[in-house]
Each structure stands twice: as C-alpha cells, then as structure tokens.
Amino acid sequence: MKSLVVVAPDQLHRKGIDILGHVDAGGTRLHLGQLDFPQPDFDGKTPANREHVLLRVRAFACNFRDKGILMDNYLQMDRLGKAYLPFGSDFCAEVVAVGSNVTTFRAGDRVMGDFAYPNAPAPGLLPGVATNFASLGWLRIHAAKLTTVPPEMSDHQAAAFALGAQTAAGMIRRSGILESGGNPVILSARSATSLFIAQQLIGYGFRPHCLSSSEWSSEQLQALPGATTGVLRPGTFPAQADHSKFTHAFDPFFDMNLEAATLLLANGGTYVTCGLRDQHPLLSDGTPEESGVALRRALAMAVVKNLSVKGNCLGESSDLAEALGAFCDTRVGPVIDSVFEPQEAVAFLVSSFFDPGRFGKCVMTLASVNPGAVTTPRTKALATATV
C-alpha cells in the first residue's frame, strides 16, 4: 500500500519515492513523499508475534505532540542513516493477521489505539501511545494496546478519536467534577483536546465556559451546544467579572494559560493541564520572556486560593471505554476539520500543525473507508504549503 513519509534530503531522487512537496517548519524544510510499502511478513506462531496484531491503516491523524516528535526524529535521520520517516499517532486500522495467543481480535476487525497511561496494559509493555508512525500504513502492535472501533463510528472518526478522547476523559475523571459538580472553564478551547473536553462535559450535563484567543464563528458554536464562549487574547487577563467564578479549569497549554486559570478559579478550585504549547525549541512560537514571572504569580495565586494543580498525561483504558460508550449513545464527536487524500500530504501536514484557523482534527485517508465516513474537507488557501 502507499505510505506517507518525510524524506531525508539526500534521498529526494531515490527510485520508488514520489516527492509530493515540502513544508518549512522552524527553519527546517521537511520533504514529503509517497512510496509503496509491501505487506510485512507476519507469522503469528513465532514467539515474537504471538501477542501481536498486523494492521493495515485505513486512516490516520496527527496530534499536537507529534509535531515536536517529528522534528526531533527528522533532525536525527542523518545520524541514524534513515532514508525516510513516518509520523502520526492516531489511527483507524483493519486487522490483517493476529498472533496465536490473540483472542480479542480477528482478521477484518477495525481497531484504534489504546494509549493507556500510566499503567501498562500488559506485563513487559510500556504505557502510552501505541505508535508514532501511523503514516507507514502497516503496523505491528501488541493486542493489549488496541481497542475495537464500534460499528457506529466511521473510519475518519475513529482515526481522530482515541488520544484526544482518552486524555479528555482522564482529565475530567481526575478533576473530581463528576463527584462534586461545579462550574468548569476550558482554556485554549478550540484546540483538539479542549474540544473533546467540552463535548464530554456537555454530555455529562455541564455548561462549560470555553475561552479561546479569537472570536468564535457560528459554525464553531454549533459544535458545542450548551457551552458558553468567550475570548481571552494572548498576554491579556480574564475579564474582571469572570475572576473567581469557576470551580474547575481544564487547560491543554499551561505555559500559555496557567496564570489566567488561577485568576478564573474560585477558592478551593481545581486546575488540570495535559501539556504545554512550546514542545520543541525550533517550533516555539514566541514564548513570552516573562513566562517565569507569570508562573511565579500563578503559583502565588494558587497558594492564596488553596487551589489544586494537577498534571495529566493521557488516560486509562477505562477512560477510552467511557468515551467510546458516550459516542455510541450520542453520536457526538470528534470534531473533524478536514479530510485529505495522500496526494494532499503537504496541505495535511500544514493544516495539522501550522494552521491557526483549524477547528478540530485533520484526517488522512490511506485506504478505502466506510461509505458513511465523514468527508467534509475545507477548501482553503494554505500559504505556508509549498509544492
């Protein structure tokens, strides 16, 4: 099948690789290519494969974390002698073959990753993401790091679901809001993870207040029925009327929003964050020089208000199961911005990582998908894409 990869500069004329264009990222030029990758050999009876599954990826998506990982891996390609580099961590795949000890899946099943963390899903396995190389098209993954895609979910929806939904469910569970109730606020609310958080909170009956750095369009508001929205521009403070108004704050980027969150939270409130915006020095988009001062002010406010500050990485298998169950009940989510074909790889990468107007996940189709799949690509100019 056709695989999408970033190609090493000295391999651009290599036979068998079709160069699709390039993307400039952090002063580095990433060349994107397509190549035929044959089905790997897989003997399910060998000890190395008994607990594993061979997958053919039907669609995949990138997460925010993948941008820094791709850059790190690219900068090491020459040292490691790599000709090309796949990328992407969310996927919907078809089971092609299973190991002799695998009883949970069979050929033809559709699966997505289970990114359970911090507890490993089986002895000897590392917790966390199932792959960082979904664009390769063929994956060999331990069965314990997979879960079945429900029949109600399209391939495109499944490819955009697991990591964000599992993280959001983990953050909500660990915040304690389901037990205590409360008035939640979501920072950077148009980010992919925040959209999952908002949808899940709405599903539980909450009316989250969603803050983003620019105005909301009517189309975007329709994706979050029952939520209230507002604007919190970078470098500004929340409106005085919102100070000490909320019981729980959910934030994907603590390096942007921690101080604002401490102002928004009431005494005894809870702040939960799952990461930071600037994850790679070459891709750090103007982190304020005064960020250390802002952090000090934020922690001082947390002390005065007796706030609980929690970090959260991914979620447990039960969190993903909870999110999948909610989807099957409501058919709500995930928010998908655009769907791309392999020849649109440059536009896909730009939209996934560098388009401030993106709303939801971008999905790349690698193989045939369900007739009911979401296919609503936006037509837009991507000025930073160069072919």
Residue map of PLM features:
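C-terminal hydrophobic helical "lid"/dimerization subdomain
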Residues: 9, 315-387
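Glycine-rich beta-strand-centered segment in the early N-terminal region that forms part
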Residues: 38-62, 73-120
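NAD(P)H dinucleotide-binding glycine-rich loop of Rossmann-like/cofactor-binding domains
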Residues: 78-80, 89, 114-188
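Residue-level marker of beta-strand positions
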Residues: 90-92, 110, 138, 183, ...
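Mid-domain Rossmann-like dinucleotide-binding core that forms the NAD(H)/NADP(H) cofactor-binding site
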Residues: 156-236
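Glycine-rich cofactor phosphate-binding loops and adjacent beta1-alpha1 units
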Residues: 176-179, 209, 219-306, 372, ...
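N-terminal Rossmann-fold cofactor-binding loop
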Residues: 211-215, 252, 313
